């Protein structure tokens, strides 16, 4: 399997059988389990069973000395899958019939009968209440305030049935109740439901709700949604009703998705004029977060500077003067840099991640699934025509390429290409000159490179590249080292080959290819030997995570700084992952699948460079080892962001995001002349 890590083994054991006979006189007893026998003289007397005594010597009716013997290897272990469900069902029936209940919860005007042990096992809140020194621990009736009685009944039902239905009519009472009772699973379900309901008319309300109940992940998603869809959000009634603090939180974001800063100013003025009498006192506080120096001179003078509310406020006039100075004095701009002069950089929208092929349940697979980080959903797309483990995956010209791999029986040189617009794979791509599995694939200067791998006979150092215009592969300079399970990355116009195995042992060496000189040159090695690692470029660093060294699968990670030619460690992932995929989607770094030394993984985790932490953030539909990952823009023909195909509210929630383009920057001389004319 291309030296992909794998695991599994079996053990078999046997048990001997013993038999004995007994009777009067000189009856004999024998046993045979491994070629041995025993006979006894003076057999069993009347009433003797003829069975071996507890000394295990196989002599009927004979009392022997106490001898420690290992237990018989013949045994049957059983774990019931039905038992938990049956037990819960019976406990719920007892509750319904008010049998053996030892506590009554008074919630609102309703009495809810229950068993303390069940509530304590499910809820940390109840566990603290009933097992501590609180007065409620000795009461048979407990009053619980500040919670909706219908929500409480649903949550108690969940404790007994493991089933709950979250819907629009109950989510706003269920989530606070689940927070109070510390039912984390229900909190997560409620937040997931609300994420799927996000649209421009309700995202601000959901954001405030998440903030109130400390649902950090929902708050983050609602913030991202608001930023991505600000042009629609600013037209909603919720936006006009925002308190000033929340308005400031939104417009100060670098990731606000607007065509120009004019939209931000217009949004602020719409909010202000919705209630001028109460809000005009906040104008300067809000306007300082509008990046006035980035406005066009015409708009700054003709619209902002001439607005009566702006002109009547001294602090606002100062902000306008600051912007004029910035536009009039380009030579002084380096000294005038600050939050208001920093261009907004909205996250690239509509990126989705594809997980392609891999190894699952003892065989190579052809399945492909797509991950949308904004909805945290994995959805199956069209499978490849061949099963491929150890496949190389890259995106070229908005098409996803799957290169080589192993189909479970043979090594492949065939290639398939996926078009997200049609959700179809085509096989009309020219094959590589060599069969390759555990191959590294990347795109550089419009060419698709296939690096290293193995062909079933040997580990390869061959490198070839594909020209999509001619549909041909051509060889380039080989690497200095043979590498299978190699990771590749493109940074600064170079192609890096990182780690892998030379067929004998894992490598920590790194080399990079210069296409201008058609030459590979070694750079500083990693601190750890790694094969079947994950690799991606993130914030101008090359990240290398997981893989396997000489002994075990790895969770450790490190990153390469090309400016200093050094590797430095970062925090380890939450799981060991060999055969892991690594990719950057919408400005976040994701580690996908792999093998932890005992099981194939379908979990994914995301890295936060600010906190230097990884966190689990979902699961694929399939466990995948040695699959490839690729990132693409979602197709424009599909309602791809913030929608759930299974949602009953599809018609309300599905809409296309419009791709916005930054206006091209004027040449400095032209801009200066125009600025002087207009100011």
From Swiss-Prot:
What CDD domains does the record tag this protein with? BACK_KLHL20, BTB_POZ_KLHL20_KLEIP
Keyword vocabulary terms for this entry: Actin-binding, Kelch repeat, Repeat, Ubl conjugation pathway
A UniProt-annotated Pfam family: BACK
From the UniProt record, list the Kelch repeat ranges. Answer: 352-398, 400-446, 447-493, 495-540, 542-587, 588-634
Query: Mind telling me which PROSITE patterns this protein's record contains?
Result: BTB
For this chain, one GO molecular function annotation is:
actin binding
Low complexity bias (residue ranges): 645-679
Q: In which pathway does it act?
A: Protein modification; protein ubiquitination
Q: Which domain of life is it from?
A: Eukaryota
According to the record, the residues making up region (Disordered) are 1-84, 643-679
The job of this chain, per UniProt, is described as: Probable substrate-specific adapter of an E3 ubiquitin-protein ligase complex which mediates the ubiquitination and subsequent proteasomal degradation of target proteins. May have a role in synapse differentiation and growth.
The protein's name: Kelch-like protein diablo
Q: Which organism is it from?
A: Drosophila willistoni
